[in-house]
Amino acid sequence: MAIQDLLQSSLFIILIGVGIPIAAFLEILFRVILPKTKRVQTQQSPQNISQEQRFPTQQKPANDETSKYSSDSIEKALKDVLGKMDKKENELLTNITNSFNEMKKLIENLNSAVEELALSVKASESDSSSPFNTIIQQEEEHVSREISTVSQLVGSNNPNNVNLTWFIKSCVLLEIMEYDEEKIKQLYELGYVSSDDMFTILRILSFIKNRKITAKELASIAANIAESYSSLTPEIKKYIMILEGGGVNG
């Protein structure tokens, strides 16, 4: 910010506008005008000596003509130099003004970018620490674990291929049969339970024995998964009502 204040100060602009033209004038004066004047005088000295030897009576007019020529040359050179200096000064001031405006705009854009970045980082930190986002993340992790559990029970490596209705139906059958494996085998032998259903039921029964969880709870987990994916069908609702003791309506 110190550089920006310096560039905006009137003293800095005055020094640039006055100091640079004066330095340029002195540079041109000592490097161009004075050496050129000395060369003209040196070249004219032998000519004056010759003319004095040939025409002694005309010495004074020759000197006057030479002085006039030298004065005209110097005046013309000064006019050219001053004209060039004015042109360069205008160009220099224009360039300084343009550069100053560009630098000012660049600094403003940089400040805006830094402010936007700071706000973005702050907003990102606020979102990541939001209790609402934490709850959503925990729910997603919980649903993911439930899907994994159900997938393992039905013997599928792809959770998307799990038939939740079929899984809940198997849990209902276990609850109705009070986890009696013999009764379930009799249903299988009579053809009321398919081999796929029997396979799933036996896996669920083994899982329940090892994890101390009920078939009703597993059915509720599967129903929650279906609800999370907006796939809670009327048939699933019917099976849940049976588990809750509400019977079957319609």
Swiss-Prot record:
**A GO term from the CC aspect:** archaeal-type flagellum
Keywords carried by this UniProt record = Archaeal flagellum, Archaeal flagellum biogenesis, Cell membrane, Membrane, Transmembrane, Transmembrane helix
Q: Which residues lie on this side of the membrane: Extracellular?
A: 1-9
Instruction: Determine if Membrane is one of this entry's keywords.
Output: yes
The UniProt regions of compositional bias labelled Polar residues, in chain numbering, are 42-61
Kindly give the membrane topology term recorded for this protein.
Single-pass membrane protein
Query: Where does the sequence pass through the membrane?
Result: 10-30
Entry-linked InterPro entries? ArlX (IPR056538)
Any domain commentary? The C terminal region is involved in the oligomerization, but is also essential for interaction with FlaH and FlaI.
Name the record gives this protein:
Archaeal flagellar motor scaffold protein FlaX
Source organism of the structure: Sulfolobus acidocaldarius (strain ATCC 33909 / DSM 639 / JCM 8929 / NBRC 15157 / NCIMB 11770)
